[in-house]
Amino acid sequence: MHTFGYRANALLTFAVTALAFICAIASFSDKFSNQNPSAEIQILNINRFKKQSHGNDEVSLTLDISADLQSLFTWNTKQVFVFVAAEYETPKNSLNQVSLWDAIIPAKEHAKFRIQVSNKYRFIDQGQNLRGKDFNLTLHWHVMPKTGKMFADKIVLPGYSLPDAYR
């Protein structure tokens, strides 16, 4: 007969293999969910647009953010990290991204929202490149599952521009 150690090892090996298989199936099942998030962002006000003492441009905005991210939630979703970034080009860099606002959405009930907020983080360009600049506001999200691979996506909202003169 087999000893207790051999039997415990066989049972533990089977349990770990079964758990790994169930986790793989759970992760794979997220691929079949229909995800169609929507978002709209409006700039309500440019609170401040100035040149800092050391030469960099700084902007403070009031944003109206409305989004419906409920379709990102499945039975396997733990939480969703969401943030708004301003994206623009300068002569030195083909893509500049500045995070303006972020939040963690813990449940599907909180995934449909509308807020008016000033940018949480400072919108500063390393130089004097923001006057008259066209830029996109992009809503990024990272879905954090209970098990499986984390994934990210975004909605790009183009057509925003800053004034030609400081305020």
Swiss-Prot record:
Keywords: Endoplasmic reticulum, Glycoprotein, Membrane, Signal-anchor, Transmembrane, Transmembrane helix. GO terms for cellular component: endoplasmic reticulum; plasmodesma; signal peptidase complex. The chain crosses the membrane at residues 12-32. Glycans are attached at residue 136. The keyword Membrane applies. It is found in: Endoplasmic reticulum membrane. GO terms for biological process: signal peptide processing. Residues 1-11 are cytoplasmic. It comes from the Eukaryota. It is a single-pass type II membrane protein. InterPro entries: SPC3. Residues 33-167 are lumenal. Essential component of the signal peptidase complex (SPC) which catalyzes the cleavage of N-terminal signal sequences from nascent proteins as they are translocated into the lumen of the endoplasmic reticulum. Essential for the SPC catalytic activity, possibly by stabilizing and positioning the active center of the complex close to the lumenal surface. Component of the signal peptidase complex (SPC) composed of a catalytic subunit SEC11 and three accessory subunits SPCS1, SPCS2 and SPCS3. The complex induces a local thinning of the ER membrane which is used to measure the length of the signal peptide (SP) h-region of protein substrates. This ensures the selectivity of the complex towards h-regions shorter than 18-20 amino acids. Belongs to the SPCS3 family. This is Signal peptidase complex subunit 3A.
